[in-house]
Amino acid sequence: PLTILPSGLYFRSETGGLLLLGKSMEEDRVGFDFAWERKRFMEILWPELAEFVPAFDTLKLMRGWAGLYAVNRLDGNAILGEWPETKGLFLANGFSGHGLQQAPAVGRYLAELITRNMPTLDLRLFSPERILANRPLTENGLV
């Protein structure tokens, strides 16, 4: 199971007895510098994790990584469908980490939209029109 703390710090068990954890922070630089900062991790994330589960303070840090994380800044949810201002431009983006989990349903939905078939899934709440209208979806538990 995935545990998400109110601050957005998340963690889950990984194969081999490992623990995977992370957190996206507003002050993170945008760009292509994928250098992982061990010191920053130890100063910011580790104390929060150990405060939540004191036994975690005895864990050994093995490695870390950094990378791009696509985020829909309006509400953190997918943007699916035809862009109203450009006919024929279909979007499937802004998943904020949900993409792999939702890919099968999204692929089916977009294929049906593009071929002008009636969608068998009702995913209209993710329509690009909500972006233009500034109508965010609310969901707790996004990381």
Language-model-detected regions and their locations in the chain:
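C-terminal catalytic lobe of FAD-dependent flavoproteins
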Residues: 50-143
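Active-site substrate-recognition segment that forms the wall
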Residues: 1-88
